[in-house]
């Protein structure tokens, strides 16, 4: 996070901060919640770090949280000396400063609800053509649960907008999996 400048609105600040911390640009950010508990600054170590980083006295902190669904293959800017931005698997997230673990928990809840109403958003995270295994893995990551392979294939069969291709994987050591693609036209027709 960072401070909001006087000459920018919240969305502009969120894009600027994302770029400063990660190097990512042209990302669709969604504002999902404000965090302003009076106890956010109860740990003196957090306050000390923040005052040093911001070079000003801190009495109260309000966070307007944003998130985005971004393909993990997007490279993060490694040239940023002050920040060690990296992709981290959800189970590997350790204790964070302030209430940032709560913010992540709330973000996960928001993403799950968002995906329920906008299932097409998941397909933006997959390659143009993908396997059932790749789609199942994505569902498992989002919903933090395991899906039976056969039942998941049945689930895919019910998704008219997930179109099987004649093409299969090449050069794999296991049985080649069929590719699928997301058909936005069919999806939009069904969703009306």
Predicted regions and their residues:
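Charge-enriched amphipathic alpha-helical scaffolds
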Residues: 146-164
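NUDIX/MutT-family hydrolases
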Residues: 63-69, 76-113, 125-133, 151-152, ...
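Short acidic, glycine/Ser/Thr-rich loop/turn "cap" segments at secondary-structure junctions
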Residues: 48-52, 87-92, 120-121
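Active-site-adjacent beta-strand/loop module that shapes the phosphate/pyrophosphate-binding cleft
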Residues: 39-74, 181-185
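Short helix-to-loop capping/linker segments positioned immediately adjacent to catalytic or ligand/cofactor-binding
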Residues: 53-55, 73-76, 118-126
């Amino acid at each position: 996070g960072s401070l909001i400048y006087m000459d920018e609105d919240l969305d502009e600040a969120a894009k600027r901060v994302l770029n400063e911390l990660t190097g990512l640009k042209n990302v669709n950010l969604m504002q999902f919640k404000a965090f302003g508990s009076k106890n956010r600054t109860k740990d003196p170590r957090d306050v000390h770090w923040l005052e040093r980083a911001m070079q000003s006295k801190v009495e109260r902190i309000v966070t307007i949280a944003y998130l985005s669904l971004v393909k993990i293959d997007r490279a993060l800017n490694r040239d940023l000396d002050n920040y060690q931005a990296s992709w981290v698997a959800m189970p590997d997230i350790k204790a964070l400063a302030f209430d940032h673990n709560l913010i992540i928990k709330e973000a996960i809840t928001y993403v799950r609800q968002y995906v329920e109403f906008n299932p097409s958003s998941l397909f933006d995270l997959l390659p143009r053509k993908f396997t059932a295994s790749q789609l199942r893995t994505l569902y498992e990551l989002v919903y933090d649960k395991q899906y039976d392979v056969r039942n998941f294939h049945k689930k895919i069969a019910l998704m008219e907008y997930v179109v099987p291709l004649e093409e299969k994987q090449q050069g794999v050591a296991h049985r080649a999996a069929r590719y699928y693609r997301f058909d936005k036209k069919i999806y939009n027709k069904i969703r009306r």
